[in-house]
Amino acid sequence: MDDADALQLCLERDRLLSDPEFARSPIMCKLLRFLVDYKLSGNSVPLKSYIIATDALGRNANFDPKTDSYPRVQMVRLRRMLDNFYLRNGGENRLVIAPNQYAIALEPNRP
């Protein structure tokens, strides 16, 4: 990721975080920040439910992704919030998280 892409990613994250819907949800803000920071770090390890739970959502090291769906539920919630934000606000770019994935991406916004 070059500097211009990183800047656009940060600007879009900040735009989302300043939205009242996101501001009312500290968990979604924390998760969004984590996903963007992870992308910016260039970490090549694919995100998994365990990493999301322990590093982003505060679960302890004993977290078992086979029995606890909390990170998956929060990711679905975040995807929904992203979709709603872009329906309301539009914009040139948008942050997306593909279904069944945890990695965030910046893409051109399609009407």
What residue spans do the PLM features occupy?
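An N-terminal, helix-rich hydrophobic module
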Residues: 1-110
